[in-house]
């Protein structure tokens, strides 16, 4: 489990999994994060999924919770789709349920889960720089974690982009902590540590 500041954090973490592939990357976020660079920075908060797509051991990418207006330029969306990334909006999750998303993710694979806090709804994760209404709910992300741990091997998880000074009543810290505990519990129940 990695807890980080900006969404550039998963880039070196994913590189460290070289040799453990193929890996299916599951990305929860309001934004697609396929920018090549922002102000000359190629490995920052808007680029982790593009960088992941360049790693030979990352086999598939599922992007869940997308809904941020203006978060991607046409070229970035085109690049993501050309790579084969499956972009699943938060609205689709709400309308069809998290199980319909899980049905699209192949079983018996290695998974890495990267969570940008703004992928969750601001009612459960308010302490973010770019809040967008309509995000995933705690129970949906919890269900995703438990299902991935059961259907394959959940190699790791990160949660990033929490802005502590915006954390109303500690709600975001509590939600992040509960997700981390669910990751640990789900992997233990799946027999990872026996």
PLM feature segments, named:
Residues 1-194:
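Conserved alpha-helical scaffold segments that buttress catalytic/binding sites
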């Amino acid at each position: 489990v990695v807890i980080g500041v900006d969404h550039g954090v998963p880039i070196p973490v994913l590189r460290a999994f070289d040799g453990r592939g193929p890996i299916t990357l599951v990305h929860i976020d309001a934004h697609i994060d396929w920018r090549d660079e922002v102000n000359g920075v190629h490995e920052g908060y808007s680029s982790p999924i593009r960088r992941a797509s360049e790693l030979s051991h990352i086999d598939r990418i599922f992007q869940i919770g997308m809904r941020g207006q203006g978060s991607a330029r046409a070229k970035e969306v085109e690049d993501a789709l050309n790579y084969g990334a499956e972009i699943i909006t938060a609205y689709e999750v709400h309308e069809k349920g998290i199980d319909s998303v899980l049905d699209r993710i192949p079983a018996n694979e290695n998974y890495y889960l990267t969570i940008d806090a703004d992928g969750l709804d601001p009612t459960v994760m308010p302490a973010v720089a770019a809040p967008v209404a309509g995000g995933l709910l705690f129970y949906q992300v919890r269900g995703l974690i438990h299902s991935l741990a059961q259907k394959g091997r959940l190699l790791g998880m990160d949660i990033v982009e929490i802005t502590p000074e915006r954390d109303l009543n500690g709600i975001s810290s509590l939600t992040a902590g509960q997700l981390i505990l669910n990751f640990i519990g789900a992997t233990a129940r799946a027999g990872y540590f026996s």
